[in-house]
């Protein structure tokens, strides 16, 4: 008798949420939070605010959705899509400050931040610049070694430093 072993695979459906701004409505966030597994929550620098973050965290908790920080350059006018030339210490502060804002809100709901996915120009620049990608990976690891760093897998500059840091 021939037995076939079927491999199981888990797929995580992930979405950028809480991006309320003049560029974007968060009208459908509650509906999306019913179908996603993890949410990248805007931390107020490119979009969103503490009230919006709190709403997303509350609904995420209710639906069992993992909460992630979605840090960006402080660029609400351009929705975080304007490239900026910042020093290493400025980049670290940018990531840490936004993570801490969301973590404080998550904690108030009995939750914690499980992952980080950079937004917009910050993420795009890291895809092209191994030094920036390494700074991001190390900063995220320094925040909490158990936090997942979501990176586009097709970008070598982001995946290599992530493997080296972990």
Stretches found by the model and what they are:
Residues 11-15, 39-41, 67-71, 118, ...:
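Hydrophobic faces of well-ordered beta-strands that scaffold small-molecule active sites
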Residues 16-20, 42-46, 72-76, 121, ...:
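Active-site beta-loop-alpha junctions enriched in small/polar residues
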Residues 22-53:
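A short alpha/beta connector and helix-capping loop motif
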Residues 48-59, 130:
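Active-site-adjacent beta->alpha loops and helix N-cap segments on the catalytic face
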Residues 129-135:
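Charged helix-capping and loop-helix junction motifs
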Residues 157-166:
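Single conserved hydrophobic/aromatic residue that forms the stacking wall/gate
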């Amino acid at each position: 008798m021939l037995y076939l072993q079927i491999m199981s695979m888990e797929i995580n459906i992930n979405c950028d949420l809480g991006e309320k701004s003049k560029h974007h409505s968060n009208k459908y966030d509650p509906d999306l939070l019913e179908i996603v597994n993890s949410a990248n929550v805007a931390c107020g620098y490119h979009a969103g605010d503490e009230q919006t973050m709190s709403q997303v965290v509350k609904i995420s908790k209710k639906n069992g959705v993992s909460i992630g920080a979605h840090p960006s350059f402080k660029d609400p006018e351009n929705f975080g899509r304007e490239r900026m030339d910042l020093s290493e210490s400025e980049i670290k502060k940018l990531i840490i400050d936004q993570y801490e804002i969301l973590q404080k809100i998550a904690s108030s709901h009995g939750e914690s931040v499980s992952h980080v996915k950079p937004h917009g120009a910050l993420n795009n620049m890291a895809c092209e610049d191994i030094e920036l990608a390494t700074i991001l990976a190390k900063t995220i690891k320094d925040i909490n070694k158990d936090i997942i760093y979501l990176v586009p897998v097709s970008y070598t500059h982001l995946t290599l430093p992530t493997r080296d840091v972990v």
